[in-house]
From Swiss-Prot:
Its cofactor is pyruvate. The modification Pyruvic acid (Ser) is found at S254. Keywords: Cell membrane, Decarboxylase, Lipid biosynthesis, Lipid metabolism, Lyase, Membrane, Phospholipid biosynthesis, Phospholipid metabolism, Pyruvate, Zymogen. It catalyses: a 1,2-diacyl-sn-glycero-3-phospho-L-serine + H(+) = a 1,2-diacyl-sn-glycero-3-phosphoethanolamine + CO2. It is found in: Cell membrane. InterPro entries: PS_Dcarbxylase (IPR003817), PSD-B (IPR033177), PSD_type1_pro (IPR033178). Pfam families: PS_Dcarbxylase. This is Phosphatidylserine decarboxylase proenzyme. Pathway: Phospholipid metabolism; phosphatidylethanolamine biosynthesis; phosphatidylethanolamine from CDP-diacylglycerol: step 2/2. It comes from the Bacteria. Heterodimer of a large membrane-associated beta subunit and a small pyruvoyl-containing alpha subunit. It comes from Shigella dysenteriae serotype 1 (strain Sd197). Its EC number is 4.1.1.65. One of its GO terms (biological process) is phosphatidylethanolamine biosynthetic process.
Amino acid sequence: MLNSFKLSLQYILPKLWLTRLAGWGASKRAGWLTKLVIDLFVKYYKVDMKEAQKPDTASYRTFNEFFVRPLRDEVRPIDTDPNVLVMPADGVISQLGKIEEDKILQAKGHNYSLEALLAGNYLMADLFRNGTFVTTYLSPRDYHRVHMPCNGILREMIYVPGDLFSVNHLTAQNVPNLFARNERVICLFDTEFGPMAQILVGATIVGSIETVWAGTITPPREGIIKRWTWPAGENDGSVALLKGQEMGRFKLGSTVINLFAPGKVNLVEQLESLSVTKIGQPLAVSTETFVTPDAEPAPLPAEEIEAEHYASPLVDDKKDQV
């Protein structure tokens, strides 16, 4: 009965307005009130502040600043084996496995379309048919920056407007085509393991989705698909990111979906639905054994995130540690 009520609310509540209100409130400096809200959040969700670079909740000027708090480097060591791809986010695996032609498993008994997830881009979908996918759910208590599973050259980014359903286990099991319906940002990379897509999926009360190379992608929510492309390799204007490097962030919890080309990687055998994930731990292994040459990432813009002009720089959070 309770679950039915929660699902009904997903269709009844004005999700867009709730999301806008949450984003507005989370960006405001409110002194002692901000600290009180953060303290209550930490207590309710059992957030481990010992992992944060700034464990004192009084050091965060807004709730958003707290929510995208950087972690200390040593708490998420990155597996250095060049044949291993690592987990991109802290959270829980919702589903994982093989993409069956155009079908991706959402929950037991529920599939959705690969092509629909990629906003009807059949050329991009062709890269991943019969490939491998991993869906990672980030709960409110989790660290909300998203990192690279491997070295990658950014080739394309697509913003897809959509619904703002919650993306927890209840909705995944009951809302058809959930991830192909919700707002999302699709990032396509060239990697040594073939093409890889990393998709940041929005949800109710997710105030914004951001990337390190472009800042805030949403809001504004203009209701139209937007597409950007970048040159390959070492060409001028290319964006290269290293394994374990931050690539984006959410303000409030959501989901990351990774797509890998067929025959390129094998998922770690121990992983299954509801497995806990930590950034830097093994996610998959290359089907070929090789040694990756050292690479340096292209410099990223030092601009600050548009949604918060006083936020830490996108590339290096250590510069203003206290």
